[in-house]
C-alpha cells in the first residue's frame, strides 16, 4: 500500500472516482445527483486506496457537487444514485431550488469578475491614451553645415549598403471546421466548438433542447446555441 501513488488535488480525486465508480461519478458532461450520505459509502469502499484521506474525499465531493455541470443535473424528476448507479429516490423540491440558487449565484460571480476585468482594461487603455496626448518636447534646431568653398574638392559619398528585400511571411492557414447538420446526432458529454465571429471556442454538450443545444465552455459558462453556430 505504501507504493501507491498519492492524489494531490481534488480534481485528481474526482478523476479517480469517475474511473472507480463510472455509474455514479463522471469526469465530463452532465453529472447525476448523488445519494444522500454517499460520503460514508466512499469511506467504506475506498479506504486505503491511493492513500486517500477523509479530508481529501470530503474536499473532492464539495468541489464535485458545487460544479456547474452537477448543479445542472439537479432538476425536477432527476433520481439520486449510489456508488454502483442504483437509484436512491427522486430529488425533492427543496434540493432542486437550492441547486438553482447556487447556479445563479455562481453565474453572477463570473459576470461580476468579467465586468471588473473589462473595467480594468478600459482604465489601463485610458491611462495609456493620456500619456500619448501629453505635449512633446520641442526639438532643438539642427546645426547648419558650412557650405563648401568654391574650388574645394568634393568628398565622394559613401555608398549605401544594398538592402535585401524582406521575406514574405505566409499567412497562417485558417483552421477548417465541419458544421453540425443534425443536432439529434449529438450526445451529452460530446466535445465540439461554438463559433463566435472568426473564432471557435471549445465546448461540451450538456443537453439537447427544442431551442438548440445547451453547451458548457471551458470557462465554465453554459449557454443554449443554435445548430448553425456549432462545428466539429
From Swiss-Prot:
**Description of the deletion phenotype:** Mutation reduces both the rate and the extent of ProP activation by an osmotic upshift, but does not impair transcription or translation of proP.
The answer to keyword Cytoplasm applying to this record is yes
Q: Which domain of life is it from?
A: Bacteria
**GO terms (BP aspect):** cellular hyperosmotic salinity response; DNA damage response; osmosensory signaling pathway; positive regulation of proline import across plasma membrane; positive regulation of transport; post-transcriptional regulation of gene expression; single-species biofilm formation
Location in the cell: Cytoplasm
Does the keyword section mention Zinc-finger?
no
Extract the GO molecular function terms from the UniProt entry: mRNA 3'-UTR binding; mRNA binding; RNA strand annealing activity; RNA strand-exchange activity
CC per GO annotation: cytosol
In this chain, the stretch annotated as Disordered covers 105-182
Q: Which InterPro entries match?
A: ProQ (IPR023529), ProQ/FinO (IPR016103), ProQ/FinO_sf (IPR036442), ProQ_C (IPR035236)
Q: Bias category Basic residues: which stretches? A: 137-146
One Pfam family per UniProt: ProQ_C
UniProt lists compositionally biased (Basic and acidic residues) regions at 117-136, 147-177
Tell me which UniProt keywords the record has, alphabetically. Chaperone, Cytoplasm, RNA-binding
Q: Domain annotation text? A: Contains an alpha-helical N-terminal domain (FinO-like) and a beta-sheet C-terminal domain (Hfq-like), connected by an unstructured linker. The FinO-like domain serves as a high-affinity RNA-binding domain, whereas the Hfq-like domain is largely responsible for RNA strand exchange and duplexing.
Q: What does this protein do?
A: RNA chaperone with significant RNA binding, RNA strand exchange and RNA duplexing activities. May regulate ProP activity through an RNA-based, post-transcriptional mechanism.
Kindly give the HAMAP family that the UniProt entry links to this protein.
ProQ
Q: Which family does it belong to?
A: Belongs to the ProQ family.
| PANTHER family noted in UniProt | RNA CHAPERONE PROQ (PTHR38106:SF1)
Query: Which named protein is this?
Result: RNA chaperone ProQ
Annotated organism of origin: Escherichia coli (strain K12)
User: Which gene produces this protein?
Assistant: proQ
Amino acid at each position: 500500500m505504501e507504493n501507491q501513488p498519492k492524489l494531490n488535488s481534488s480534481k485528481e480525486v474526482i478523476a479517480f472516482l469517475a474511473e472507480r465508480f463510472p455509474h455514479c461519478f463522471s469526469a465530463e458532461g452532465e453529472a447525476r445527483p448523488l445519494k444522500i450520505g454517499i460520503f460514508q459509502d466512499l469511506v467504506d469502499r475506498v479506504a486505503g486506496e491511493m492513500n486517500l484521506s477523509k479530508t481529501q474525499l470530503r474536499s473532492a465531493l464539495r468541489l464535485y457537487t458545487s460544479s456547474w455541470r452537477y448543479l445542472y443535473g439537479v432538476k425536477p424528476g432527476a433520481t439520486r444514485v449510489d456508488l454502483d448507479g442504483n437509484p436512491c429516490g427522486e430529488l425533492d423540491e427543496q434540493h432542486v431550488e437550492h441547486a438553482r440558487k447556487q447556479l445563479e449565484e455562481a453565474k453572477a460571480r463570473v459576470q461580476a469578475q468579467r465586468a471588473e476585468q473589462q473595467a480594468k482594461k478600459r482604465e489601463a487603455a485610458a491611462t495609456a491614451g493620456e500619456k500619448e496626448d501629453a505635449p512633446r518636447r520641442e526639438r532643438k534646431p539642427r546645426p547648419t553645415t558650412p557650405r563648401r568653398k568654391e574650388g574645394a574638392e568634393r568628398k565622394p559619398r559613401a555608398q549605401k549598403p544594398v538592402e535585401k528585400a524582406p521575406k514574405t511571411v505566409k499567412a497562417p492557414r485558417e483552421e477548417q471546421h465541419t458544421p453540425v447538420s443534425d443536432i439529434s446526432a449529438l450526445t451529452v458529454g460530446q466535445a465540439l466548438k461554438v463559433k463566435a465571429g472568426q473564432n471557435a471556442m471549445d465546448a461540451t454538450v450538456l443537453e439537447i433542447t427544442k431551442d438548440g443545444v445547451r453547451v458548457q465552455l471551458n470557462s465554465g459558462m453554459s449557454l443554449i446555441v443554435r445548430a448553425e453556430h456549432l462545428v466539429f
